[in-house]
Amino acid sequence: VKLYDYVLDHLSLPFQQPGNKIRSAVLFHSEHYQVGKNALFEMIRLGLGKDNCTIITPENAVARERNFLENQLVLIDEILIDGDYKKRLSTLNILKPLMTQELHDSRPLFKNWRQVHSTCKMMLFTNFKNAISVKNNEARYTIIDVGKTRDEMGGDEFFNLFWNTDGTIVEEYPEIVKWFLSTRQISPNFNPKSISLKTKFLETMSKEGGHPLLPE
């Protein structure tokens, strides 16, 4: 499957097969800012419904409450795991079972531990090449470099089409995104239980992120 279709398959599955868990995650990297991440995340969130999609920080992702597990799609924003490779390794080892397993321990504030069944899918975004520590044969993260600036993508003339002056998304666009992702054919060879696609940028992030993760 081509990378373009692979990403669309990841986005389509929560709309078409909400109970089918994807056991890997897509991580977008861009060294540039204002390249449409917020517009994409918000349109997906509104398309799925606010109760089915949430945007969280890395700190929320590893906290014991894990309220986000009840969503169909979890978007983890501004990934940058501070500290040495050991801390990055520890954090990713917490995240990986959340991506690959369906039963998780959760402890909401002032409540006892409980077990939660979740088929949530995950996507991540970062502006930093050294955001995580991954080995060159990492099998659970498809790491994609968004190699264009805002101007190269069309600049304000393009991006302003999606936003109202009050900072909200133009109402029709989430519906268009929802229709497209709900009706497009998922690639016949896309296997949500399979390993991630290996990209050229995986090697870059492996070098920049310090000591690599051990493979599963």
What is each stretch, according to the model?
Residues 150-168:
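Conserved phosphate-binding loops in nucleotide/dinucleotide-binding enzymes
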Residues 70-72, 118-121, 136-141:
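Short glycine-/polar-rich loops that comprise or flank the Walker A/P-loop
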Residues 72-99, 131-138:
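Conserved AAA+/SF3 P-loop NTPase catalytic/coupling segment centered on the Walker-B
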Residues 132-152:
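A short helix-turn-beta junction within AAA+ P-loop NTPase domains corresponding to the substrate/partner-engaging
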Residues 1-79, 177, 181:
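P-loop NTPase catalytic core of nucleic-acid-dependent motor ATPases
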Residues 49, 89-114:
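Conserved catalytic/switch belt of AAA+ P-loop NTPases
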Residues 32-33, 188-216:
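DNA transaction DNA-binding modules
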Residues 63-69, 107-125:
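AAA+/SF3 P-loop NTPase mechanochemical coupling elements
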